[in-house]
A protein has these predicted regions:
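Conserved, mostly hydrophobic/aromatic
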Residues: 16, 27, 62, 93, ...
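N-terminal small/glycine-rich loop or linker at the start of catalytic domains
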Residues: 21-37, 94-110, 160-161
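Hydrophobic faces of well-ordered beta-strands that scaffold small-molecule active sites
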Residues: 22-28, 66-67, 93-97, 135-137, ...
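Active-site environment of divalent metal-dependent phosphoester hydrolases
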Residues: 29-33, 68-76, 101-103, 141-145, ...
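Alpha-helical scaffold segments that flank or form the walls of functional sites
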Residues: 38-89, 112-136, 165
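Active-site gating/metal-coordination segments in enzymes
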Residues: 104-161, 193
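Active-site core of metal-dependent hydrolases
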Residues: 144-203
Length: 203
């Protein structure tokens, strides 16, 4: 069924190619210069140009939407706004800003450390005030933070629940880094919208 009568067109026929809608990449960290596994310290300028290259690579590979789940100093929102304004070329972006983690927990170097329900609620409100599109929470440890047990539960169910409550009141979704089983369950019982990784899901 067409919305208008059929008519001839002079557009060329595309042969031996495939046309698809734009792809979504729903878990990225756009300021990671060369991926994981390096101890090199990068300057802010280096990270900025790597970010620009990553954005161009997404577009050139057909990715037209990305979900950015954790960026130091909330820089992803500045980048998002520059893309939206046409200052830099890149895909559409949903940005989480900094993650919320327990003190010394996974992602503490670039996240907001929060302990107890009051601090967690304040952290969520701070991010929402800055304009995040969603809120990222650290429910468990992770392999990229030295001295942390990747599978261990970190933020508690009660701590995550108040973060999720604040996000939902503002009309925002939530996502959690969750690898170990107990942390995954804590996040689910707290009302999380999205489990990231879920390595040790048991059902």
């Amino acid at each position: 069924i067409a919305i208008e009568d059929y008519h001839e067109t002079n557009e060329p026929v595309v042969e031996a190619n495939v046309v698809t809608p734009g792809f979504f990449n729903c878990h990225v960290h756009i300021m990671e210069p060369v991926g994981f596994g390096t101890d090199k310290e990068f300057t802010f300028i280096e990270k900025t140009f790597y970010t620009q290259k990553h954005l161009e690579d997404y577009i050139n590979s057909g990715v037209t939407f990305i979900r950015v789940l954790g960026t130091e100093n909330d820089y992803d929102m500045d980048i998002r706004d520059c893309v939206d304004a046409g200052i830099v070329k890149g895909p559409h972006m949903l940005c989480a800003g900094r993650c919320i983690c327990m003190t010394g927990g996974h992602g503490w170097q670039g996240g907001i450390e929060a302990d107890g329900q009051d601090e967690c609620r304040k952290a969520a409100r701070t991010l929402l005030k800055k304009g995040v599109d969603l809120v990222k929470i650290m429910a468990t440890g992770g392999v990229m933070t030295k001295g942390v047990e990747p599978g261990s539960a970190q933020l508690t169910q009660e701590e995550m629940a108040v973060i999720i409550e604040e996000a939902h009141k503002a009309g925002r979704k939530t996502a959690t880094h969750a690898q170990g089983t107990q942390g995954i369950k804590n996040a689910l019982y707290a009302g999380i919208d999205s489990i990231e990784h879920g390595i040790f899901l048991d059902q």
